[in-house]
Amino acid sequence: MNQVQTLTGPHIRTANTTRNIMLHVAISLMPALLGSIYFFGIRSLYITGFSVTVCVLTEYFWQKITKKPVTANDFSAVVTGILLAFNMPVTVPLWVVALSGIFSILVVKQMFGGIGCNFVNPALMGRLFTMVVWPGAVMQYVAPRTLTTTGFDAVSSATVLGTVKNGGEAGYSYLQMFLGETPGALGETSKLLLLVGFAYMCFMGIVNAEAALTYIATVIILTFIFGPAGLFTGDILLNLFGGGLILGACYMLTDYAFASRRGRLLYAVTAGIITAAIRIFSFYPEGICFGILTANCLGGALSLLYK
Protein backbone atom coordinates (compact mmCIF):
# COMPACT_ATOMS: atom_id res chain seq x y z
CA MET A 1 0.00 0.00 0.00
CA ASN A 2 1.27 3.48 -0.85
CA GLN A 3 2.14 5.68 2.11
CA VAL A 4 0.82 9.24 2.28
CA GLN A 5 2.95 11.58 4.34
CA THR A 6 2.33 15.20 5.23
CA LEU A 7 4.67 17.93 6.31
CA THR A 8 3.78 21.02 8.26
CA GLY A 9 4.03 23.88 5.76
CA PRO A 10 5.87 25.27 4.02
CA HIS A 11 6.23 22.25 1.75
CA ILE A 12 9.81 21.14 1.30
CA ARG A 13 11.38 20.07 -2.02
CA THR A 14 14.97 19.45 -0.98
CA ALA A 15 17.31 16.83 0.40
CA ASN A 16 18.24 19.02 3.38
CA THR A 17 17.73 17.64 6.85
CA THR A 18 14.64 18.63 8.81
CA ARG A 19 16.81 20.64 11.18
CA ASN A 20 18.42 22.67 8.40
CA ILE A 21 15.08 23.27 6.72
CA MET A 22 13.35 24.43 9.88
CA LEU A 23 16.33 26.60 10.77
CA HIS A 24 15.94 28.40 7.44
CA VAL A 25 12.20 28.79 8.03
CA ALA A 26 12.89 30.26 11.47
CA ILE A 27 15.43 32.65 9.96
CA SER A 28 12.90 33.71 7.33
CA LEU A 29 10.47 34.69 10.09
CA MET A 30 12.94 37.09 11.73
CA PRO A 31 12.04 40.15 9.60
CA ALA A 32 8.38 39.81 10.57
CA LEU A 33 9.36 39.30 14.22
CA LEU A 34 11.48 42.46 14.20
CA GLY A 35 8.58 44.25 12.54
CA SER A 36 6.20 43.12 15.27
CA ILE A 37 8.56 44.54 17.90
CA TYR A 38 8.62 47.86 16.05
CA PHE A 39 4.85 48.00 15.58
CA PHE A 40 3.66 46.55 18.90
CA GLY A 41 6.57 46.95 21.30
CA ILE A 42 8.96 44.66 23.16
CA ARG A 43 6.10 42.51 24.48
CA SER A 44 5.95 40.97 21.01
CA LEU A 45 9.39 39.49 21.63
CA TYR A 46 8.37 38.25 25.09
CA ILE A 47 5.27 36.54 23.70
CA THR A 48 7.20 34.92 20.86
CA GLY A 49 10.05 33.77 23.08
CA PHE A 50 7.63 32.39 25.64
CA SER A 51 5.64 30.57 22.95
CA VAL A 52 8.80 29.00 21.52
CA THR A 53 9.96 27.94 24.98
CA VAL A 54 6.63 26.29 25.80
CA CYS A 55 6.53 24.44 22.47
CA VAL A 56 10.11 23.17 22.70
CA LEU A 57 9.80 22.06 26.33
CA THR A 58 6.45 20.36 25.68
CA GLU A 59 7.97 18.37 22.84
CA TYR A 60 11.09 17.51 24.87
CA PHE A 61 9.29 16.31 28.00
CA TRP A 62 6.67 14.36 26.05
CA GLN A 63 9.34 12.50 24.11
CA LYS A 64 11.29 11.84 27.31
CA ILE A 65 8.20 10.53 29.11
CA THR A 66 7.17 8.31 26.20
CA LYS A 67 10.79 7.19 25.61
CA LYS A 68 10.77 8.37 22.02
CA PRO A 69 13.76 9.87 20.20
CA VAL A 70 14.09 13.49 21.25
CA THR A 71 13.65 15.79 18.26
CA ALA A 72 13.16 19.02 20.18
CA ASN A 73 16.41 20.35 18.68
CA ASP A 74 15.24 20.05 15.06
CA PHE A 75 13.72 23.56 15.14
CA SER A 76 10.25 22.34 14.11
CA ALA A 77 8.84 23.18 17.55
CA VAL A 78 10.61 26.54 17.33
CA VAL A 79 8.84 27.30 14.06
CA THR A 80 5.50 26.22 15.53
CA GLY A 81 6.09 28.48 18.53
CA ILE A 82 6.91 31.48 16.36
CA LEU A 83 3.92 30.95 14.08
CA LEU A 84 1.62 30.45 17.05
CA ALA A 85 2.79 33.76 18.52
CA PHE A 86 2.36 35.42 15.13
CA ASN A 87 -1.34 34.51 15.31
CA MET A 88 -1.83 36.22 18.68
CA PRO A 89 -2.48 39.88 19.51
CA VAL A 90 0.05 41.74 21.64
CA THR A 91 -2.47 41.86 24.49
CA VAL A 92 -2.85 38.07 24.79
CA PRO A 93 -2.26 36.71 28.32
CA LEU A 94 0.81 34.49 28.60
CA TRP A 95 -1.20 31.66 30.15
CA VAL A 96 -3.29 31.52 26.97
CA VAL A 97 -0.08 31.31 24.93
CA ALA A 98 1.15 28.49 27.18
CA LEU A 99 -2.01 26.40 26.92
CA SER A 100 -2.20 26.99 23.19
CA GLY A 101 1.42 25.90 22.74
CA ILE A 102 0.91 22.75 24.80
CA PHE A 103 -2.20 21.90 22.78
CA SER A 104 -0.43 22.51 19.46
CA ILE A 105 2.58 20.34 20.25
CA LEU A 106 1.14 17.67 22.52
CA VAL A 107 -2.29 17.03 20.99
CA VAL A 108 -1.97 18.12 17.37
CA LYS A 109 1.63 17.12 16.67
CA GLN A 110 2.97 14.48 19.06
CA MET A 111 -0.18 12.43 19.63
CA PHE A 112 -0.40 11.95 15.87
CA GLY A 113 3.18 10.72 15.64
CA GLY A 114 5.29 13.86 15.44
CA ILE A 115 6.61 15.84 12.50
CA GLY A 116 5.54 14.41 9.16
CA CYS A 117 2.59 12.55 10.69
CA ASN A 118 0.31 15.35 11.90
CA PHE A 119 -2.28 16.03 9.22
CA VAL A 120 -3.10 19.61 10.22
CA ASN A 121 -0.95 22.63 10.93
CA PRO A 122 -0.22 22.68 14.70
CA ALA A 123 0.06 26.46 14.95
CA LEU A 124 -3.26 27.00 13.19
CA MET A 125 -4.96 24.41 15.37
CA GLY A 126 -3.56 26.19 18.40
CA ARG A 127 -5.03 29.41 17.08
CA LEU A 128 -8.40 27.75 16.51
CA PHE A 129 -8.28 26.24 19.99
CA THR A 130 -7.88 29.66 21.58
CA MET A 131 -10.54 31.20 19.31
CA VAL A 132 -13.07 28.64 20.51
CA VAL A 133 -12.15 28.54 24.21
CA TRP A 134 -10.97 32.11 24.89
CA PRO A 135 -12.17 34.25 21.95
CA GLY A 136 -11.89 37.48 23.91
CA ALA A 137 -8.20 36.87 24.55
CA VAL A 138 -7.16 36.42 20.93
CA MET A 139 -9.61 38.51 18.92
CA GLN A 140 -9.00 41.93 20.48
CA TYR A 141 -6.40 43.91 18.58
CA VAL A 142 -4.67 47.25 19.04
CA ALA A 143 -3.52 49.87 16.56
CA PRO A 144 0.25 49.62 16.06
CA ARG A 145 2.96 52.20 16.03
CA THR A 146 3.26 54.02 12.69
CA LEU A 147 5.78 56.32 11.07
CA THR A 148 3.93 59.29 12.57
CA THR A 149 3.30 57.93 16.08
CA THR A 150 5.60 56.99 18.95
CA GLY A 151 3.85 53.87 20.22
CA PHE A 152 0.93 51.54 19.71
CA ASP A 153 -2.61 52.45 20.82
CA ALA A 154 -3.66 50.33 23.79
CA VAL A 155 -7.34 50.80 22.94
CA SER A 156 -8.84 47.61 21.50
CA SER A 157 -9.92 47.75 17.87
CA ALA A 158 -10.94 45.43 15.07
CA THR A 159 -8.79 44.42 12.13
CA VAL A 160 -9.27 46.25 8.85
CA LEU A 161 -11.25 43.33 7.42
CA GLY A 162 -13.38 43.17 10.56
CA THR A 163 -14.16 46.88 10.40
CA VAL A 164 -15.16 46.73 6.74
CA LYS A 165 -17.16 43.54 7.33
CA ASN A 166 -19.24 45.41 9.90
CA GLY A 167 -19.97 48.23 7.49
CA GLY A 168 -17.26 50.68 8.56
CA GLU A 169 -14.51 52.40 6.63
CA ALA A 170 -11.12 50.71 6.48
CA GLY A 171 -9.41 53.75 7.96
CA TYR A 172 -6.03 52.75 6.54
CA SER A 173 -4.44 53.11 3.13
CA TYR A 174 -3.33 50.13 1.08
CA LEU A 175 0.28 51.18 1.69
CA GLN A 176 -0.28 51.12 5.45
CA MET A 177 -1.81 47.65 5.15
CA PHE A 178 1.19 46.47 3.14
CA LEU A 179 3.74 47.94 5.53
CA GLY A 180 1.97 46.72 8.68
CA GLU A 181 0.53 49.90 10.18
CA THR A 182 -2.85 48.31 10.95
CA PRO A 183 -4.40 46.44 13.89
CA GLY A 184 -3.85 42.70 13.79
CA ALA A 185 -1.97 39.73 15.15
CA LEU A 186 1.75 40.09 15.84
CA GLY A 187 3.11 38.50 12.69
CA GLU A 188 0.38 39.09 10.15
CA THR A 189 0.30 42.86 9.74
CA SER A 190 3.48 43.57 7.72
CA LYS A 191 3.03 41.93 4.36
CA LEU A 192 6.29 43.46 3.19
CA LEU A 193 8.35 41.70 5.87
CA LEU A 194 6.50 38.41 5.41
CA LEU A 195 7.26 38.52 1.68
CA VAL A 196 10.92 39.27 2.43
CA GLY A 197 11.03 36.10 4.51
CA PHE A 198 9.17 34.11 1.87
CA ALA A 199 11.57 35.34 -0.82
CA TYR A 200 14.45 34.10 1.35
CA MET A 201 12.89 30.62 1.52
CA CYS A 202 12.38 30.60 -2.24
CA PHE A 203 15.98 31.71 -2.79
CA MET A 204 17.22 28.92 -0.54
CA GLY A 205 15.11 26.43 -2.49
CA ILE A 206 13.23 25.04 0.50
CA VAL A 207 9.67 26.08 -0.35
CA ASN A 208 7.28 25.49 -3.22
CA ALA A 209 5.81 28.90 -4.03
CA GLU A 210 3.25 27.59 -6.51
CA ALA A 211 0.74 26.43 -3.90
CA ALA A 212 0.97 29.72 -1.98
CA LEU A 213 0.42 31.81 -5.11
CA THR A 214 -2.48 29.61 -6.20
CA TYR A 215 -4.11 29.96 -2.80
CA ILE A 216 -3.75 33.75 -2.84
CA ALA A 217 -5.06 34.02 -6.39
CA THR A 218 -8.11 31.88 -5.60
CA VAL A 219 -9.06 34.01 -2.60
CA ILE A 220 -8.67 37.41 -4.26
CA ILE A 221 -10.43 36.34 -7.47
CA LEU A 222 -13.46 34.93 -5.66
CA THR A 223 -13.72 37.83 -3.20
CA PHE A 224 -13.54 40.24 -6.16
CA ILE A 225 -16.24 38.42 -8.13
CA PHE A 226 -18.62 38.06 -5.18
CA GLY A 227 -18.17 41.53 -3.75
CA PRO A 228 -20.30 43.13 -1.03
CA ALA A 229 -22.15 45.37 -3.50
CA GLY A 230 -22.76 42.74 -6.18
CA LEU A 231 -20.78 40.86 -8.79
CA PHE A 232 -17.26 42.12 -9.49
CA THR A 233 -17.33 44.74 -6.73
CA GLY A 234 -14.85 43.21 -4.31
CA ASP A 235 -11.76 45.08 -3.15
CA ILE A 236 -8.75 43.06 -4.30
CA LEU A 237 -6.10 44.97 -2.36
CA LEU A 238 -8.18 45.01 0.81
CA ASN A 239 -8.54 41.23 0.72
CA LEU A 240 -4.88 40.80 -0.16
CA PHE A 241 -3.35 43.14 2.42
CA GLY A 242 -6.09 43.73 5.00
CA GLY A 243 -5.81 40.45 6.90
CA GLY A 244 -3.73 37.32 7.34
CA LEU A 245 -3.81 36.01 3.77
CA ILE A 246 -0.08 36.49 3.13
CA LEU A 247 0.92 34.87 6.43
CA GLY A 248 -1.45 31.97 5.80
CA ALA A 249 -0.27 31.39 2.25
CA CYS A 250 3.46 31.69 2.91
CA TYR A 251 3.74 29.90 6.24
CA MET A 252 0.52 28.10 7.19
CA LEU A 253 -0.61 26.30 4.05
CA THR A 254 0.30 22.65 4.63
CA ASP A 255 1.14 21.27 1.20
CA TYR A 256 0.75 17.51 0.94
CA ALA A 257 3.51 15.63 -0.84
CA PHE A 258 1.64 15.26 -4.09
CA ALA A 259 3.62 13.69 -6.88
CA SER A 260 1.41 15.51 -9.40
CA ARG A 261 1.24 19.24 -9.94
CA ARG A 262 -2.50 18.92 -10.46
CA GLY A 263 -3.05 17.52 -6.98
CA ARG A 264 -0.95 20.24 -5.38
CA LEU A 265 -2.83 23.01 -7.16
CA LEU A 266 -6.23 21.47 -6.41
CA TYR A 267 -5.29 21.37 -2.75
CA ALA A 268 -4.40 25.08 -2.77
CA VAL A 269 -7.56 25.96 -4.70
CA THR A 270 -9.66 24.03 -2.19
CA ALA A 271 -8.17 26.01 0.69
CA GLY A 272 -8.73 29.23 -1.25
CA ILE A 273 -12.37 28.48 -2.03
CA ILE A 274 -13.17 27.74 1.61
CA THR A 275 -11.32 30.84 2.81
CA ALA A 276 -13.11 33.05 0.28
CA ALA A 277 -16.51 31.52 1.07
CA ILE A 278 -16.06 32.31 4.77
CA ARG A 279 -14.98 35.87 4.00
CA ILE A 280 -17.93 36.39 1.67
CA PHE A 281 -20.83 34.56 3.29
CA SER A 282 -20.09 34.25 7.03
CA PHE A 283 -19.83 36.78 9.83
CA TYR A 284 -16.11 35.97 10.21
CA PRO A 285 -13.97 38.55 8.39
CA GLU A 286 -10.94 36.30 7.86
CA GLY A 287 -11.44 32.62 7.03
CA ILE A 288 -7.73 31.76 6.81
CA CYS A 289 -7.74 29.42 9.79
CA PHE A 290 -10.88 27.55 8.76
CA GLY A 291 -9.97 27.40 5.09
CA ILE A 292 -6.50 25.96 5.51
CA LEU A 293 -7.45 23.54 8.29
CA THR A 294 -10.38 22.19 6.27
CA ALA A 295 -8.09 21.69 3.30
CA ASN A 296 -5.62 19.93 5.63
CA CYS A 297 -8.36 17.46 6.54
CA LEU A 298 -9.23 16.89 2.88
CA GLY A 299 -5.60 16.61 1.83
CA GLY A 300 -5.35 12.88 2.49
CA ALA A 301 -8.23 12.12 0.14
CA LEU A 302 -6.85 14.48 -2.51
CA SER A 303 -3.42 12.89 -2.28
CA LEU A 304 -4.94 9.47 -2.99
CA LEU A 305 -6.73 10.84 -6.06
CA TYR A 306 -3.70 12.71 -7.40
CA LYS A 307 -0.57 10.77 -6.54
Task: Please place each PLM-identified region on the residue numbering.
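Cytosolic-side transmembrane-helix boundaries in multi-pass membrane proteins
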Residues: 1-21, 282-307
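N-terminal signal-anchor module of multipass membrane proteins
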Residues: 1-56
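C-terminal ends of transmembrane helices
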Residues: 9, 57-69, 105-116, 196-205, ...
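Hydrophobic alpha-helical segments embedded in the membrane of multi-pass proteins
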Residues: 27-29, 53, 75-83, 98, ...
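Structural signature of hydrophobic alpha-helical transmembrane segments
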Residues: 41-53, 91-100, 177, 181-191, ...
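Membrane-interface helix-loop-helix junctions at boundaries between adjacent transmembrane segments
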Residues: 73-77, 82-150
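Loop-to-transmembrane alpha-helix initiation sites
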Residues: 119, 123, 236-245, 264-267, ...
